[in-house]
A protein has these predicted regions:
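Generic detector of well-ordered secondary structure
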Residues: 24, 32, 51, 113-116
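N-terminal single-pass transmembrane signal-anchor helix
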Residues: 1-34, 42
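N-terminal alpha-helical signal peptides/signal-anchor transmembrane segments
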Residues: 29-33, 43-63
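Charged, low-complexity, helix/coiled-coil-prone segments
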Residues: 10-19, 53-65
């Protein structure tokens, strides 16, 4: 009988399979951590925008609030959206006593995160035009719109 030297094909496939599992697990952990970090940064950015808007316009009313106004006043650095696509806005209600930060193009997961996270700076949240804090109005197809209202 001949003696074997080296590894068998089964052993090599087993080692490669273990390596593939480790790589895919690492990728999944990275993705989860990355998404969580992006959402935390977006949350803090929204809070910062709301705080600076209140500081600038609380006593004079929010009628003229806009992204361009906040950039010109130095409250925010750019018109880059904190989350979702780049189609976002800051608007006031009719009498100027309240303003909203409107984010468009949010995925279902982002929508669910922002509607379930407690944000003490908001008076209420609107999801796809419905006033609610429940995720039941988040569309699974994506392209969700959330408005955060503050006074």
């Amino acid at each position: 009988m001949r003696e074997q030297s080296g590894r068998s094909l089964i052993e090599i496939i087993g080692v490669l399979a273990i390596g593939a599992i480790m790589v895919s697990g690492t990728y999944a952990i990275y993705n989860t951590t990355n998404q969580k970090q992006k959402r935390l940064i977006a949350s803090e950015t929204l809070k910062d925008i709301a705080t600076k808007t209140k500081t600038l316009l609380e006593y004079s009313g929010y009628q003229n609030v806009s992204i361009d106004f906040l950039i010109e006043s130095g409250a925010i650095n750019s018109n880059k959206s904190p989350a979702g696509n780049q189609d976002w806005s800051i608007t006031s209600n009719v009498d100027g006593t309240e303003f909203s930060i409107n984010l468009n193009g949010l995925s279902f997961d982002e929508c669910a995160y922002f509607t379930t996270k407690k944000m003490d700076w908001t008076t209420h949240i609107s999801v796809n035009g419905f006033d609610s804090s429940a995720t039941s109005y988040c569309l699974k197809t994506g392209d969700n719109k959330i408005s955060f209202y503050a006074k």
